[in-house]
């Protein structure tokens, strides 16, 4: 990971910069291949950050005052998760779920995503959780390569109910801790 990057829980004073992060990522995706299917003003937006902050589940990677990335870590599966055959069988009390892993375009290929995943895994172990689960829109090859490189195993492909946004299929991943 790039030297000087610190990963920590977000605080209210970070919200404007997180909103800016989301906006700049979506702007970048509009002019490049939009692997995750994110759209400015639709997802991710400030309200997503506010809700995660209120639940104490929003974490950020910072370089000085610049937010290079963020991730939401909670125990809330998407509705389609029940249709999968996971590696572990437990309640979501002992399973961490990764949502909205975001890296600013200026920090792509700098190890921010890998660092956020390592941070998530450490946080999950401390709870203690037995595994981490996540979903990624089918065809988001950069994200899938990252997850596979970090030891996540693809479980299956399901609908999460986002067909209206042109996102019919998601690949599910799990890493046993």
What are these model-derived regions, one by one?
Residues 1-16:
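Conserved N-terminal entry element of GNAT/NAT acetyltransferase domains
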Residues 117, 124-135:
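Conserved GNAT acetyl-CoA-binding A-motif
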Residues 103, 109-122, 145, 149:
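Conserved acetyl-CoA-binding loop-helix of GNAT-fold acetyltransferases
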Residues 90-91, 130, 137-144, 148-150, ...:
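C-terminal "cap" of GNAT-fold acetyltransferases
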Residues 72-100, 108, 161-164:
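Conserved acyl-donor/pantetheine-binding loop and adjacent beta-alpha core of acyl/acetyltransferases
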């Amino acid at each position: 990971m790039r030297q000087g990057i610190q990963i920590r829980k977000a605080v209210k004073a970070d919200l404007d910069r997180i909103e800016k992060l989301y906006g700049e990522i979506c702007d970048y995706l509009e002019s490049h291949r939009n692997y995750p299917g994110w759209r400015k003003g639709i997802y991710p937006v400030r309200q997503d950050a506010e809700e995660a902050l209120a639940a104490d589940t929003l974490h950020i990677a910072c370089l000085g005052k610049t937010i290079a990335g963020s991730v939401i870590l909670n125990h809330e599966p998407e509705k389609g998760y029940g249709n999968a055959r996971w590696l572990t069988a437990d309640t979501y009390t002992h399973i961490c779920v990764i949502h909205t892993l975001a890296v600013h375009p200026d920090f792509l290929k700098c190890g921010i995503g890998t660092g956020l995943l390592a941070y998530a895994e450490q946080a999950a172990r401390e709870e203690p959780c037995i595994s981490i689960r996540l979903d990624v829109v089918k065809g988001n090859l950069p994200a899938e390569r990252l997850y596979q490189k970090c030891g996540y195993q693809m479980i299956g492909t399901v609908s999460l109910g986002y067909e209206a946004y042109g996102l019919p299929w998601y690949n599910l991943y799990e890493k046993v801790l």
